[in-house]
Amino acid sequence: YSAEGRLDQLRFFDHWLKGIDTGIMSEPSVKLLIRKGGHGNSEWRFENEWPLERTRWTRFFLQPHARNGDESLGRLMAEAPRKTVSMSYSASGKTKAGVASASWTSTALAGSLPQMGVSFETAPLGDDTEVTGPVVLVLWVASSTEDMDIFATIRNIAPDGSDVFELGQQSQPVPVGKGWLRASQRKLDPALSLPWRPYHVHAERQWLEPGEPVRVEIEIWPTCMVFKRGHRIRLDVQPRDGVGSAPYTHYAADYNTGTNTIFAGGARASYLLLPVIPRRA
């Protein structure tokens, strides 16, 4: 939606539809907008492949950990807990999907609603950290009912605790990335799935057995962000639309009530797989 992006489209169509040599086919095959936090703080960069060959696929393991008495806030760690632990939350949250939980003010500006889902944060980053490429969230989950809606959001948290938003195509504030999955749709096509991109078949419903843990892989759309030194990477896992959802909201299934649980560590390690890009020498 940028001026340069529209110009690239025009150059592409001029080349193929009008036979005009715009030079676009002589450029590298991948062009990325490298976001550095905040509207207007970005730059264009050429690459030769996607995902980037130099990607360091890095697992950030979920670790439940109360901080300042907040039982819903855990940590993203380099190592998984040795023993399996868990965090539970209400499957319905405090609001109705499509009303307060998906409103402009509550999800786009004010941040996540209290007592809705659980969150995990890294420690303050010691250096600027670029994340560019596809993202996958692997969770071990259970529910007290037959299904479970999972809304995953990646956020850029400044040292003062505020969100660093980007600007969406309709000028709305947006977080770093989002992904969604209904647990009954978790079945994968092993031939088409990749370590960094699960491919769900959506051909049958695999209902949950109440209280029985299952493994799910959630695709979070490809993104790019340079998290600045001192910032935190935050992951929200919620039963409803979270921060930065407006105007594209969802309505959760009526049967998704009760209690959802996320497991971490031991044989049920949950993790966020991020494409960390090392600095070029």
Residue spans of the language-model regions?
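C-terminal, loop-rich substrate-recognition/catalytic regions characterized by aromatic stacking residues
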Residues: 1-281
